[in-house]
């Protein structure tokens, strides 16, 4: 009997919660059991809850289902319409409430491969456009030191405007960080200027073929400067690179020693930039680091440009360029080539952050193929059969080297994890 009394008291409590009218307690009814008394008190206190029916789809409703989601006090309904709304809210399945709270997946989360492909496309597109426009400028304005300054100047202005609007937020810098970044920026400036001297004096395709030797200098610096052992497969993969560049250089129609030597200096400079970058690792994001490096490199590049090319520019350089293409085109070409230079470097960094090193290495090789191919088509450069074969061998060697190096790095990370 006690069990039966408890059950009947609980049922009375549920019935009281489901009544629309206020229940009138009878003093003559005895409540011998504490649980039944408590249930009747709860029913009297909450008798204003809208009537939702005791059975829904053949199931007994629980009192907790009818309690409001927010707040601990029950309020009486103000109108029949609000009563109906309350009943519909009470009878709504729990899944309907939780489904509304789930945030729909954004476009970036739903299609990551598509976004990564877009980054690769922009990287290639900006790089090809930069190289073509850069060479067109040198065809009527052969002053690579000044053009190098313009590249960096436009990039610095872009960074300053981005910092002003907070995209990205400028990271603070101190004297210690400046000392770490200065060697990196110095090598960046030297490599950038010598690359442009090479682009101005030889064909773009040949300059990029010479720059394919950069992995060889990286391996040599790692082995003999940093004292880190380079695996034998990496050294062997560099043999076709050296062979291909040698074959292409022997029969290149646009070959001259100024372009060749400056391209080699550029390779060495960018190699040391990589070495100093490893020593200057900071917690600053790559966008801010590249911005500070560009600012320092700009300051470094201005004096040589003024000393070496300043007098010629003032005498006839600017006037000759304006006479050939006009002031508007001359200024717009310089602005856009600087903008494309900064953007393609920034997109290359962002692409590296999205993909594995192996994917980025393969993409970098394909980028060089695109640049060489499009430059030959756009400028109609004549190349000999031996130069074409040598270029293909060099690019294939770089691809093999990049693949082996990326696999070795992945194995090292897997072992350390």
UniProtKB/Swiss-Prot annotation:
Q: Which GO terms describe its molecular function?
A: antiporter activity; carboxylic acid transmembrane transporter activity; organophosphate ester transmembrane transporter activity
GO cellular component: a single term: chloroplast membrane
Compartment(s) where it occurs, according to its Swiss-Prot or TrEMBL record: Plastid, Chloroplast membrane
Q: What is its main location?
A: plastid
Positions of transmembrane segments: 113-133, 146-166, 180-200, 230-250, 257-276, 289-309, 321-341, 360-380, 383-403
Which tissues is it found in, per the record? Expressed in stems and leaves.
- Transit peptide segment: 1-40
Instruction: Show the segment(s) annotated as Disordered.
Output: 75-100
Sorted alphabetically, the keyword list is: Chloroplast, Membrane, Plastid, Sugar transport, Transit peptide, Transmembrane, Transmembrane helix, Transport
Q: Topologically, how does it sit relative to the membrane?
A: Multi-pass membrane protein
Q: What domain of life is recorded for the organism? A: Eukaryota
Q: Name one GO biological process term.
A: monocarboxylic acid transport
Note the NCBIfam families from the entry.
tpt
Family per record: Belongs to the TPT transporter family. TPT (TC 2.A.7.9) subfamily.
Q: Which PANTHER family match?
A: SOLUTE CARRIER FAMILY 35
Described purpose of this protein according to its UniProt entry: Triose phosphate/phosphate translocator that may function in the export of photoassimilates from chloroplasts during the day.
Which named protein is this? Triose phosphate/phosphate translocator TPT, chloroplastic
